Amino acid sequence: SITCPASVNGLVGFKPSVGIVSRTHVVPISSTQDTAGPMTRTVYDAALLLTAIARPDQADPVTLEAKRAPDYTSGLDTASLNGVRIGVLRGAVGTRTDVKALFE
């Protein structure tokens, strides 16, 4: 678990795609979903740590063919979102007006 423990402790948790980070020494539960990832105080720190740990590992063959970014902090530049479309599933927002206002 990464994202739930991080959220209840006021941290940033990032769960990378399987193969980006080695699963060596991770207690196996699901070979298609197991992954390790950073829990940090800031988004920048999570991206920096992911850059450091995202490496191929001979002991974890899934990591050998994964495509990785050379520097995950480069995606934090606001210009990196130019041209990106972000969708909001309106039905999942609920009926509370304060929650709806946050999505607008």
Where are these regions (language model features)?
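FAD-binding core of FAD-dependent oxidoreductases
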Residues: S1-G10
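A short helix-breaking turn/cap at a secondary-structure junction
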Residues: V12-L102
